[in-house]
Amino acid sequence: MKKKLTSLALAGAFLCLSFHGNVQAQESSGNKIHFINVQEGGSDAIILESNGHFAMVDTGEDYDFPDGSDSRYPWREGIETSYKHVLTDRVSRHLKELGVQKLDFILVTHTHSDHIGNVDELLSTYPVDRVYLKKYSDNRITNSERLWDNLYGYDKVLQTAAEKGVS
């Protein structure tokens, strides 16, 4: 438990520092932050690297979206279908380039599809010790135009985490 809290605190510190300009670690420190995004805005993913350990903060948009045939996941205006904000391939390529074999944790800042989208793919591809995310509720979204496919992505994460035994 103490190790997980330390990891979470480290992730929080890295995240806070990322809002104050460029963060640079000494070459010998073994600590790096890798930012992956699309130039047009929207989808982001952050890989934290520390002495051979890896974690992620947000995972970017994925290729999956509901088609509206399931009443739990209605078609909504604003669901990204053009793939211009998808980070699945970039995240996968970057993790491979870094030699990642396992993720200590994935921290999702909020459950919009452009932050949670690739969690299920990562859980299916890599061993992950823990996923940190808030319980989803449409009530937290004050602008109905931003409901998108958030619940769909959230449910996919829960299903894949349960299948992989990740809490």
Where do the protein language model's features map onto the residues?
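Non-globular, low-confidence helical/coil segments that flank catalytic cores
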Residues: K2-K3, S18, N22-S167
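Bacterial N-terminal signal peptides that target proteins for export
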Residues: M1-A9
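Bacterial N-terminal signal peptides
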Residues: A9-S18
